[in-house]
UniProtKB/Swiss-Prot annotation:
It catalyses: 5,6-dihydrouracil + NADP(+) = uracil + NADPH + H(+); 5,6-dihydrothymine + NADP(+) = thymine + NADPH + H(+). Its EC number is 1.3.1.2. Pathway: Amino-acid biosynthesis; beta-alanine biosynthesis. Its cofactor is FAD; FMN; [4Fe-4S] cluster. [4Fe-4S] cluster 2 binds at C91, C130, C136, Q156. Residues 69-100, 944-976, 978-1007 form the 4Fe-4S ferredoxin-type domain. The modification N6-acetyllysine is found at K384. This is Dihydropyrimidine dehydrogenase [NADP(+)]. It comes from the Eukaryota. The gene is Dpyd. [4Fe-4S] cluster 1 binds at C79, C82, C87, C140. GO terms for cellular component: cytoplasm; cytosol.
Amino acid sequence: MAGVLSRDAPDIESILALNPRVQAHATLRSTAAKKLDKKHWKRNTDKNCFTCEKLESNFDDIKHTTLGERGALREAVRCLKCADAPCQKSCPTSLDIKSFITSIANKNYYGAAKLIFSDNPLGLTCGMVCPTSDLCVGGCNLHAAEEGPINIGGLQQFATEVFKAMNIPQIRNPSLPPPEHMPEAYSAKIALFGAGPASISCASFLARLGYSNITIFEKQEYVGGLSTSEIPQFRLPYDVVNFEIELMKDLGVKIICGKSLSTDEMTLSSLKENGYRAAFIGIGLPEPKKDHIFQGLTQVQGFYTSKDFLPLVAKSSKTGMCACHSPLPSIRGAVIVLGAGDTAFDCATSALRCGALRVFIVFRKGFVNIRAVPEEMELAKEEKCEFLPFLSPRKVIVKDGKIVAMQFVRTEQDETGNWVEDEEQTVRLKADVVISAFGSVLEDPKVKEALSPIKFNRWGLPEVNPETMQTSEPWVFAGGDVVGMANTTVESVNDGKQASWYIHKHIQAQYGTSVPSQPTMPLFYTPVDLVDISVEMAGLRFPNPFGLASATPATSTPMIRRAFEAGWGFALTKTFSLDKDIVTNVSPRIIRGTTSGPLYGPGQSSFLNIELISEKTAAYWCHSVTELKADFPDNILIASIMCSYNKSDWMELSKMAEASGADALELNLSCPHGMGERGMGLACGQDPELVRNICRWVRQAVRVPFFAKLTPNVTDIVSIARAAKEGGADGVTATNTVSGLMGLKADGTPWPAVGIGRRTTYGGVSGTAIRPIALRAVTAIARALPGFPILATGGIDSAESGLQFLHSGASVLQVCSAIQNQDFTVIEDYCTGLKALLYLKSIEELADWDGQSPPIISHQKGKPVPRVAELMGQKLPSFGPYLEQRKKIIAASKIRQKDQNTACSPLQRKHFNSQKPIPAIKDVIGKSLQYLGTFGEMSIMEQVVALIDEEMCINCGKCYMTCNDSGYQAIQFDPETHLPTVSDTCTGCTLCLSVCPIMDCIRMVSRATPYQPKRGLPLAVKPVC
């Protein structure tokens, strides 16, 4: 049988050992064997495992919400972008959540970050530490669906981290005059105390408003407040805090460290004497609440408050926080953490990283009363912290100068709801360290006296107006923890944001200037926003290259008006005709495509429609065009018209449209359904002679530019475009919808089906599914007719896809299906996205980025993974015994590295500046044409092969299966580790990369040896017939 060509050779049979086969019978395997199997392949924690993972000195990211680019794109596409989105109503800083998620889904990470930072200057910090389950995620409408709510925090973190990697500075609002030309009020002295989230937010917004004399006074030698000193590195890295502070400093805000609000240094009275017009108090709550039973206990004996412990951990683990280097607190044995808030859980998980053997989280009430967010509680549970509810501390037991145990009494809730302590029920817990996390207060008399004469409430905190954040002293404002209303970082940020507007209002009033009663907060700007994306085509200047196609978004002129108000650069009217050709539509007529599979809701890859041209009269459209041009003179408005093959009709209608004031005309010669039966649309657009003549007639009738709208339903679209040019057309639109039949139901009836007869017809397919057809048409016309203007349409749904059409030779871009999927506001995403894509081309340091996508590092679930192969010379997957082995190797590596930390200076952010000119739209038009050609022009000598990154591989075997049954059997799949290995028989076909679910897990690299095709039989062998 060895000579049988149609059977796999023995070596191939060996490769195919794990390839799926059709099952011919049920499978039998013993329960005992299956339990062993389960253990080998297990990826989550074994419920029978009670040992703690060694976490000492491991400050790697532990958040479940963290996302890589793949995860972010999948999650963003899932979002419904709801009309009156509840998530946005639940965000303290009122983030435009659905819009920034739209930008992420469209790979416009700059646009997403711009939206986030516009409402929240600490958008990256909040993306990492926000209790989203209680805020935005808590209101997500997808809670009502099987797949559950959107990971909003992870998306926010991802977009802002990508922006952070761009190293682009923040700039002042471009519409403001230079600082030296601003009114005198904007140079007023403003002081802020405490460099935490509330003050950073307040100062950022004041600087965006135009104020130039803003100083933050911070008593510590580091900045960031609790974000730096108390939120652990594994939840919030210091470089994130530093990045947001540097963004603030980009606007000229000054920070002076080592200066505190105290009678010993600075007071409100001294500020006023020194000419400060406004002050903001954002000092937090600096002293810990401490139970009387801890009097006299110190760190030497093993007692810490959270205010002692967490800053010590931070100084050791947060590189760049300060110039000094200090070791982690030496924690051994059992640790008791008292409290049930977020801080208590931070103490617990940090204690494990300081060497604790076991951690007990003890709290007075039950699990249902835990104040910490579920995310924090779940992480502590996963790290094997023990939870002990219903216990109130009574006594600390010290022996030989060291804590050895604590005594508690049981608590319970009585019938009236009050909590009582039962002194008869006592519990004694052995412990080596006790950490108290019972909250914080403002008690320092020197600080309180320095705040005089502001009033304090019954909790000893500054009394403020909750709407303005103004204290009893009109020029003094306060926010954050010190006010007692903000319980989270994001609420502190909003306090600062809120205060900034009323500080602005107060200062302006002092100078006799009024401000709007409705706050108008300034946005976040960078040099990207200065990029010019206007473009000229056929003598017309388009404000930006994005416009409404002659389709459903242009059903009426009020819709076009709203589109122009939203920022669209141009629009086409819905195609209209002479009254004698007026139409009436059927219904149903616009349906979702089947190309998206079982994806319902927004994000459809295609639609099919059997809608005809506009049902409205030519008079309606012409009157409306006149109105719109009067109100939007800078926007381009193109009238789309259609007639049968009749010279007088075309001349009459085109003159009518020109007289209305339309900037240009589009001749619809391509409607693929319905109109062709009337001798219009497709009936005219498939014959070059008819197209040429119609264009000649219109050229004789009008002076304004006109464009022929072409159909892709022809063999040679170039011949149609050439005919249009020969007829005098100023350009073409490529392309209209593709004729198709979307699907049939199980009973054989079509959808859409009209009337009781369930009739249908071939319709027009639109959306991203037809983008390859449209790109082919645009590039073919651009190559054949250089310089001939092309209006592209067909699957444009983002700045990235729009740039593809510009690179293909189009000058402007028409959009329809993407608006059907969302709404007119997507234009903001398209414009910021295109500006970013152009701007990034000017930065040498980002030359290895793919648009707005940075190079992907080896990661699992969005978190960088140590390359275990480099640590021990062995490749290990991330499941079962191999996962346990990986954890041990990484733990040992972290302990080895802990003593290698060296002192370092505070981090300095380096801006990436443009080294090359920022390309204009005209510079990128047709850029890709140089790469297109015939098959014979491609090299058969420069071959590639697949290279798999085992650290990123999730061991699914999709590459293996497609190579076996659709390729060349060049991938081996280990039966124990499920690690795929590419053999030297790889032909570089790239199918494996195409089906791999993990971005950049497989790369195609240059082949090191000459490629020798397998011919089956030598070329000299003749066939046997």
